[in-house]
Amino acid sequence: MSDYEVRPATLRDAKAIAEVHAVAARAAYEGILPEDQLSALAPTTREAKWREAIEFSEPQVQVAEIGGEVVGFVGFDRSRDPKTPSTTGELWAIYVKPEHWGKGVGVALWDAARDGLEEEGCTTVTIWVPLRNERAMRFHELAGFKREMKTAKTTAIGSVKIEEIRLKRSV
């Protein structure tokens, strides 16, 4: 674990973040999304989004790197959900390259996000997770998140509808 460094993202990281996002999302959603939707998860479609997020700190973005290579990232900020108290934060995204799954990178990123949310005055944090993404569900539950069963919603990803549920915990 000590080999990973977590730090705030810079504009130079946008391309690497987009690549991590694409490869990790493709691995996470294989079997959940059809091939044409997985193919649409290309880094080129995400780089501008992450560049803008880093530039304007919305969301705040931290990266995990080893040997100068970005292997994971987390985006977090105040909750985007309507009618949510200003003390509620949200993990907007947390992705790690599949070859680094289970090695503590996600935990290090979550710790950095929790520290950042605490600095922002957040007392609780949420994340939306597709019900069929068992790996993500397990990760967040091991990190202390609890399912809010009354929050289930359907989100369209391209032509596919995905059932999501919000998880929540104290910061």
What are these regions (language model features)?
Residues 17:
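Hydrophobic pocket/interface hotspot
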Residues 11-14, 133-134:
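Alpha-helix N-cap/helix-start and coil->helix boundary motif
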Residues 93-111, 118-120, 130-138, 142:
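Conserved glycine-rich acetyl-CoA-binding loop
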Residues 62, 87-89, 123-137, 141-171:
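C-terminal "cap" of GNAT-fold acetyltransferases
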Residues 4, 8-12, 22-32, 36-99, ...:
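Acetyl-CoA-dependent GNAT
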Residues 1:
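Short, conserved catalytic or adaptor-binding loops enriched in Gly and charged residues
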